[in-house]
Each structure stands twice: as structure tokens, then as C-alpha cells.
Amino acid sequence: MLQISFNGARLKEARLFNKKSITQIAEFLNVSKQMVSKYEKGRATPSEESLEILEKKLKFPRDFFFGNDNFSLSSTGTFFRSRYTATQTEKMPAEINKNYVALIRDYLGEFIDFPNLDWGLSGLDYTPQEYASYIREKWELGDRPIDNLSLLMEEKGFVISRIDTQSDKVDAFGSAVKVNNNEYYVVMLEGIEYSFYRQQFSLAHELGHWLMHEKECLEECLAHSTCSINVSYANDGILTLVTQLGISFPALRETYTVYI
């Protein structure tokens, strides 16, 4: 009979997803921090009682902690559009969600013919103004306002998802995720109560990062889990795209304190 062993990496994943520290898990289980560390490193297995507590506190099913990955997954450094006070603990649930979205997209790709992203459009030697014109020409947008940037980006091969991790310090983020031999660019919008215009702005920002920074991110940020945004770039280049999206300036001013 095949015996499935406890997967410590899954415990760590569930812990980070729930923004919990090793100390907090140790308190839940009434064990030492060293023991929790052993669990996560696969050097020890929690008792049945401890497993029941983990299921309840972390809200992951028991089978999750005994599963094994049958895929390979890697991600470039993530561009977060967030406040400077956002911590790694606050960003981690969104990071894990991003990977889940990429896995779902990869699975569904076996049954659905999704559009393919043209990676050759990113990393070209253009100014933000030139890039805005170039993309409009390549995507045959003309001079008309873009009514729904989310739909447009999905039609062009981006993977867009909305989540709510109860974070008020992260608006949106995106990065390339490779599942087995398939690469996707996933853009996550944080929160479910933001206005349509704010989501449009966030998507324009992430599109700008993909166009101008994705290859730079791949080369320079692999040693880090996240990449900070360049504020001067955001205030200069991204607004060039935003002003062509059909967003009303009063709404933009109210949300971002941006004056055009």
C-alpha cells in the first residue's frame, strides 16, 4: 500500500497564505517553534490532533498537507503597485494567489484555446510615449478610448484575476509565471470594492511594467521575491497610457491625487 508522507512545504505555503508566523503556528499547536520548523522542512510529522488544528486555523483541507506537486513552477520578480509600508507578510498571500491562478490557467489551457501573449512586444527601446503609440498600432486600437482594458488585455493573452486578501496596502501586481514549459503573464487586482476607473489605472500601470520592465525584471530581480516600482516612471510613463484609456480626469485626480 502506497503511504503518502506529510508535505512540509505545503504547511509553509498555507501558513504564509494566512499571514501567520512560525510562532503563531507553534502557539496554535502548543509545540515549540523548532518543531514547527521541523514540520515545514519535512523532518517531522504533526500528530492527528495537530493536523485537525491546522485544518481549522489555516482553512486548508487535510489532503493538501499530504499532496505532492506534479508540476514545476517558477516566477520572475513581481512588480507590486503598493504603498511603501506594505510588508512581505502582507504581499505573500497575493503572491501565492498569483501562482494558483497560473496553475488554473495552465490546466484550463488543455481544454480551452486561449489567446497567446506576444512576448516580443515587451522590452523594446521606446520611450513611454512611443510605446503607447506603438501598442495602439500593433493592437489596431486607433485613437479611440479603451473602454475596458481588462477585456482587451485578456484578449491579447494576459491572465487577469481579482482577489481580496483584506490588504489595504496592495492595489495590483504582476509577473511572468512559468508552469512546466508554459509561460504566462499574470496580473492580479487586489480588493473587490475599488471603482472601475481605479482598476483601469492599475491595469494600465501593470501593462506599462510588462512593456518596459519585464525583461529587466527577469535579469535583475531573480534574487528577490518582489521588485519595487519606479515612482518617477509611474508618474511619467504610465500616465501617458492612462490618458488614452478614456478615464475621466476628475476620477483620476480624486483617487490618485494626479493633476494633468
Q: What label would you give each PLM region?
A:
Residues 1-260:
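Short juxta-domain linker segments that transition from a proline/glycine-rich
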